[in-house]
Amino acid sequence: PEGEEGGAALMIKEGVLENPKVDAIFGLHINSQTPVGVIRYKSGGTMASSQRFVINVIGKQTHGSQPWGGVDPILISAKIIDGLQTIISRETKLIDEPAVITVGKITSGVRFNIIPESAEMIGTIRTLDYDMQKFINQRMMEMVPAIAKAFRGEATITINNGTAITYNDPDLVTQMLPTMERVAGAANVQTQKAITGAEDFSFFQEKVPGFYFFLGGMAPGTTESYPHHTPDFLIDDSGLLLGVKTLTEMSLDYLAK
């Protein structure tokens, strides 16, 4: 939340990586759609960077029965949302890395029969490549005010960085792969594709080599489960034991190198 620094960034600021100095870092995330006993990982870019954007649209208030007397910020907002998606579908080379622009909140309006003066949109940008992120940011900054102007309104956009790309150090992954296979069994250690979720563990990885993997939490005998951040999310706690063992053995093997 705004005004709070929680998580990895604050821990780093307070010196968690110093005294003693940290040489490497390991982390895991439970996954409700991976079977208990299975570990999934990816070398290199694993989880997306996250940015938060706010778009403010200014129109001119008028009665809903006389739209020609005003400038409709809700209509402009709809056009902006539509335009933003073309950045992803028509301008971003998705065969290289995935990218997402999502408007998650729209606030506007005073009454059902009034065209309001303003609208606000808040959303997120997810990328796995910083050059791609820079391009998407630039196009959003160009497109938002231009679309508003085309409909006789005004719009501003601010983009704030959230988390960095969760990047698994390839050498560290190679070093730790035998450890994971020994603990979980080679057949239970599986590669996966990058995902567009974000993780502040990435801030640690900007400072020291890191390895972040996913631990199975789907109950044995289950073929489907609900994803994270849904009302029916559920994991099997028995899967946590493998996570403890894996992190312990990783630490011991790394220190013994």
What are these regions (language model features)?
Residues 1-116, 198-199:
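Histidine/acidic-residue-rich, glycine-tolerant segments that coordinate divalent metal ions
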